[in-house]
Swiss-Prot record:
GO molecular function: RNA binding; structural molecule activity
Pfam families: Paramyxo_ncap
Name the UniProt record assigns to this protein: Nucleoprotein
Gene Ontology cellular-component annotations: helical viral capsid; host cell cytoplasm; ribonucleoprotein complex; viral nucleocapsid
Segments for region (Disordered): 437-469, 517-549
Gene giving rise to this polypeptide: N
Species this protein is from: Mumps virus genotype N (strain L-Zagreb vaccine)
Amino acid sequence: MSSVLKAFERFTIEQELQDRGEEGSIPPETLKSAVKVFVINTPNPTTRYQMLNFCLRIICSQNARASHRVGALITLFSLPSAGMQNHIRLADRSPEAQIERCEIDGFEPGTYRLIPNARANLTANEIAAYALLADDLPPTINNGTPYVHADVEGQPCDEIEQFLDRCYSVLIQAWVMVCKCMTAYDQPAGSADRRFAKYQQQGRLEARYMLQPEAQRLIQTAIRKSLVVRQYLTFELQLARRQGLLSNRYYAMVGDIGKYIENSGLTAFFLTLKYALGTKWSPLSLAAFTGELTKLRSLMMLYRGLGEQARYLALLEAPQIMDFAPGGYPLIFSYAMGVGTVLDVQMRNYTYARPFLNGYYFQIGVETARRQQGTVDNRVADDLGLTPEQRTEVTQLVDRLARGRGAGIPGGPVNPFVPPVQQQQPAAVYEDIPALEESDDDGDEDGGAGFQHGAQAPAVRQGGQNDFRAQPLQDPIQAQLFMPLYPQVSNIPNHQNHQINRIGGMEHQDLLRYNENGDSQQDARGEHGNTFPNNPNQNAQSQVGDWDE
């Protein structure tokens, strides 16, 4: 029997590795599009700044073809290079397009009409067509310029430092657009705005040279549609990773942004490794995890075997990225997500409620994390030289803090199927903060009376900022999943007209409060005995701040 199990383990591992081709093998050649890339052989800052604006206009032009935008993007990312001719050779490695270099001496005064070098393979009709494309901006671009400030294009640029500041400000916006171009391109641009603010604070991005949001979106769309550009950017990212501490500004900037791009599309895999294997807690010994642990082992070997480009599987559209999908290890993924929601507040920004998420193992992860937060790693404790008394003190400290934040109080399981912003938020984070007041628009008819006989509000689950708590289970399938682990959830009243408190806006909800009989909604009484009546004219101030960043 042991030989069969060993054979199964080898089979699982080899199944992930056997379909890889030899490194550097050339794929069968397909039809290639001709891409014209412009090269400037002089360091003239005026000419390069005009080329920067010309490329931005070609990318944003409403009638430009895909090959025009690809050539403009490669030219744009090559402008800081002292030798553009050599730098563009990075794009020659792509099997997707045929790169044609066109050497440019400059532009005709006051226009975007190219002045080609004698060696450039450009006809008069192509030069005229490029000039028309540069002036053909869509109506969604305001003031006839891609920049927010209309006078930026016409400003003189006669110093190398001026050109580099403007060029880096534009390129850093283009690189930020690369971060989400393959994984969440249609999501709100909150993360991009935060990164822009970061680089402005660092002095890498000058606010005066900000592009319009529509221009940024068009750049992101062009990058998303072009595998040639993304392969070129991958080579740039690899060059930036190899740089030492003494590097130029451009590759230091690319290396910084590369941290946001690396391993995109592999978040589920790395979170599973972090919260399931990294914690090394006892549920890993469950027999149900045995096969999936072998799967994770084979995936780790596959990732190491892919080499340096494994970090950019999503950017390269590599088919191997499908091997890392969490659908291949759903049970241990569910367990890891349960652990992560308790340990890491940033997990609330990650959509882990997949169709294959198992509610039982998610709750096992939640309960394990809550109970094991105070455990001590004996090996680390031995390295630190902790005595048994010190280890006990650390455990008691964590347990005491966890109890103060409401851990372990019954009130229902964490519901992974409800988005975090819709789940009920804690009434009080610490014991010295009073409970929140009832909503002003609750519509109760009890005249604002408190709980009967002066009773306090019934105890409900209160969690810290890492705690995602459930709403009453309406779905019978979900109720079936969670009921065995939390039988007390059936005691929570299930009314259709729940009274909801608002915290800082419409999307924040407080816990529901009921009287001691659980049959009607009454006024909430704070932990210090103060009653919050249902009076629309009385607005007590909450002491709990927003839960969103």
